[in-house]
Amino acid sequence: MSDSNPLGALIPNREDMRCCEGDASAEISHAQLDSITDAVRHQYGALAKRAAERASSSTKASDRFYTEEQRYTLTDEAVGASAGCGNPVGIADINLGETVLDLGSGGGIDCFLAAREVGETGYVVGIDMTPEMLDLARTNAEKLQTGNIVFKLGHIESIPQEDNSVDLVISNCVIALSDKKGRVFSEIFRILKPGGRFVISDVVTD
């Protein structure tokens, strides 16, 4: 697990995620998964608050994954709220005029970088389930005077976006936290235009 991600202990192992037989076991399993989702939301909400107060900064991660030029164009709060494990924008080969959607957009760091790549004729959508992160991202957008981004409240397992409407989906160390990864990928394919693509930076394990 990348040391930039504050939620390593919250990712369930295979034993926790096993399919169970019987209603009682299934109910316990669902309760565990609900607890994980709540914990993820709580931890990222706390990270957003610390970043807004500039009491926390993921500079170690941002130094490793983002260039000095990229960091210079962002707010301190956007960098401080980053809990990613890579830089999907750096390898996505984004084109002018494209529509890009970021799953688990957090404080908006990858959205802001993507917005520069798509230009004024393009559009970026950030999806996050944490209200505090959405508030921070929208504040960052105002500070950066970025007009081609919208941030939406939603879950990556049920993306609030129209079918066949996105050229590129990106995600940075978020899908690993979902217990319904198959549904996430189905949603990605649903919203992608024909010939669309997705670029994901994430944690994997055998």
PLM regions and their residue ranges:
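N-terminal auxiliary segments of SAM/dcSAM-dependent transferases
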Residues: 2-64
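Conserved alpha-helix/loop element of class I SAM-dependent methyltransferases that forms part
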Residues: 60-99, 110-113, 117
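A short acidic, Gly/Pro-enriched loop at the edge of an enzyme's catalytic core
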Residues: 96, 157-168
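Conserved SAM/SAH-binding beta-strand->alpha-helix loop
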Residues: 130-132
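Conserved SAM-binding loop
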Residues: 137
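Conserved SAM-binding strand-loop segment of SAM-dependent methyltransferases
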Residues: 145-157
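A short SAM/SAH-binding and catalytic strip from SAM-dependent methyltransferases
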Residues: 167-180
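A short glycine-rich, Lys/Arg-flanked "PGG" loop and its adjoining helix->strand segment in the class I
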Residues: 182-197
